[in-house]
């Protein structure tokens, strides 16, 4: 079937944009400046912890990110090592979940609702956010100091680009290598991603 040049050009541009799409962790602050070419590697290419860690609450926290994919799967790994330098230093602490939507997303992240154990006030940890929009796993890390009394500043906005996102919860995935699989299971419905992945309802932060 004949394809008009204009339509073909637009279709090609859309395809290229999809292939090059990524995500950017907004809060907590990532380990270093976003480097698109390095995001498929450990901690977006940053092997060493940040000099200035982000204070983060043991309960009632959230994560904000910008998604450039219309359909994506995500999960969180955590390391309690003082200087985590490889995937082997991290353990999966949330199920993987799938969501629809591009733009800014606020994902409630209550550490007390994850399977992480032994976390304490004042402890230094690192989280690694795993994101897959269909073109392979992408990674960004954030180095944190945990606090039982800290409240995230109201200047850090917790809002979502879409409230019509659907989600699927997934079981545990392997975390020992960069090629950990991101599977799916039946859908939860509106705002299901934050309940399935991070342990509390989206309604508590909107």
Curated annotation (Swiss-Prot):
Binding-site residues, Cu(2+): 22, 69, 135
Cofactor detail note: Binds 1 copper ion per subunit.
Membrane topology of this protein: Lipid-anchor; GPI-anchor
Compartment(s) where it occurs, according to its Swiss-Prot or TrEMBL record: Cell membrane; Secreted, Cell wall
Record propeptide residues: 180-206
Name of one Pfam family that matches: BIM1-like_dom
Cysteine-cysteine disulfides: 43-141, 106-158
Signal peptide, first to last residue: 1-21
The keyword Signal appears for this protein: yes
Lipid addition sites, GPI-anchor amidated serine: 179
Main localisation: membrane
CDD domains named among the record's database cross-references: LPMO_auxiliary-like
Role noted for this protein: Lytic polysaccharide monooxygenase-like protein that has diverged to biological functions other than polysaccharide degradation since it does not perform oxidative cleavage of polysaccharides. Involved in fungal-cell-wall remodeling during Laccaria-Populus symbiosis. Acts as a cell surface-bound protein that functions in the copper-accumulation pathway. May also act as the major cell wall sensor that regulates MAP kinase-dependent hyphal anastomosis, the fusion of hyphal cells.
Keyword Transferase listed: no
Organism, scientific name: Laccaria bicolor (strain S238N-H82 / ATCC MYA-4686) (Bicoloured deceiver)
Protein family per UniProt: Belongs to the X325 family.
Recorded name of the encoding gene: X325
Name the record gives this protein: Lytic polysaccharide monooxygenase-like protein X325
UniProt keyword annotations, A-Z: Cell membrane, Cell wall, Copper, Disulfide bond, Glycoprotein, GPI-anchor, Lipoprotein, Membrane, Metal-binding, Secreted, Signal
Cofactor(s) of this protein: Cu(2+)
A GO molecular function held by the record: metal ion binding
Induction: Expression is up-regulated during Laccaria-Populus ectomycorrhizae formation.
A cellular-component GO term for this protein: plasma membrane
